[in-house]
Amino acid sequence: MKDLVERFLSYVSIDTQSNPSAPQCPSTEKQFNLANQLVSELNELELSDVSIDENGYVMGRLPSNVDYDVPAIGFIAHMDTAPDASGENVKPQIINNYQGDIITLGTSGEELTPSQFPDLLNLIGHDLITTDGTTLLGADNKAGIAEILTAIAVLKANPEIPHGDICVGFTPDEEIGRGANLFDVKKFNAKWAYTIDGGPVGELEYENFNATSADVICHGVNVHPGTAKGKMVNSMNIAAQFQMMMPADETPEGTEGYEGFYHLKSMNAGVAKTELGYIVRDFSREGMAERKAFMQQKVNELNAKLEKGRVELVLTDSYFNMREMVEPHPHVIELAKEAMTACDIQPDIKPIRGGTDGARLSFMGLPCPNIFTGGYNFHGIHEFITINGMKQAVDVIVKIAELNASNNK
């Protein structure tokens, strides 16, 4: 049986960064390098119905080992890594028996310090895997892949552990918001599933943001600066006025918990035309409606002031809070909580201040909460994971499978 850490290190050595500018699926051909390896590993584990489609979605099924009906459940992770930092030539460091000191990340000059990352102080005695300070690690979400496959290997090696059908799925392009777009829920054939894509040990999430993209387009008039008086309209000045109308404290860096925000994420600026790219987030549908109305109101106010419709607002919904689709199936959450408790883990139920494949899948008819991986600081060079936490994730996956069978006997 492949060791959990060995699997993980193998996966992070493969660059699978996704590309939001590419329209195809997967957005980068290199995601197939990991996808094809996972197909081989699923076949080595002798799973049934192993497949990969033209879009890079990998699926397989561990058949039930009991002689009574048990609902099929699934475990899902994504193969791509975030565009925010390089995923090429990842060089992990293993820190055994961490003692609370500063961790030097290779020769990059970067460090993991308890003062900046206080979670480290809760991990004394743990074995950590870090980056070398030049790339992300890829624990998001290759740790989830390693944990799922290791759990499957445990179930295969221990046939005395009862379980129903276990469906496994690995998706491309989650980091650019498309991971569930072409996921074949009918083919997957699970009653419900769990993404293994969370952070610290104990995390259990079934609420996420409602998400909208807001593009503000400001139109100006470009004239030679030497003859511009009374003629030029600088669209960048209009854009600046609009941004100043946004609530200064309702930003990602100023909010937490269930608080929503407006986030100016990008800007393409010129005198004649400036485009502001916002993402807007709120946990309630009502709150999101109010945020959309607020932005439209500010556009209207600015247009009235400018005496011409120089500002446009284009709103596009991205995903919705899965809570409304998961709560009607309380057993899905209760099973995960029961499994964690049986593994001496205190469930830490909190909202996801983001989105997951599970959010989209829940609205596609597959209730799909999110479970921890044991990782921290995703999407950047300070990403790290605890080997202890990874092993606990494996234990929880195995226990969910076991309890699902025993509870339905």
From Swiss-Prot:
GO terms for biological process: peptide catabolic process; proteolysis. HAMAP family: Aminopeptidase_M20. Its cofactor is Zn(2+). Zn(2+) 2 binds at residues 140, 175, 379. Pfam families: M20_dimer, Peptidase_M20. GO terms for cellular component: cytosol. It catalyses: Release of the N-terminal residue from a tripeptide. Zn(2+) 1 binds at residues 78, 140, 197. Belongs to the peptidase M20B family. This is Peptidase T. One of its GO terms (molecular function) is tripeptide aminopeptidase activity. Keywords: Aminopeptidase, Cytoplasm, Hydrolase, Metal-binding, Metalloprotease, Protease, Zinc. Cleaves the N-terminal amino acid of tripeptides. It is found in: Cytoplasm. The keyword Membrane does not apply. Gene3D superfamilies: 3.30.70.360, Zn peptidases. Transmembrane segments: none annotated. The active site is at residues 80, 174. SUPFAM superfamilies: Bacterial exopeptidase dimerisation domain, Zn-dependent exopeptidases. It is an enzyme of class 3 (hydrolase). Its EC number is 3.4.11.4. Binds 2 Zn(2+) ions per subunit.
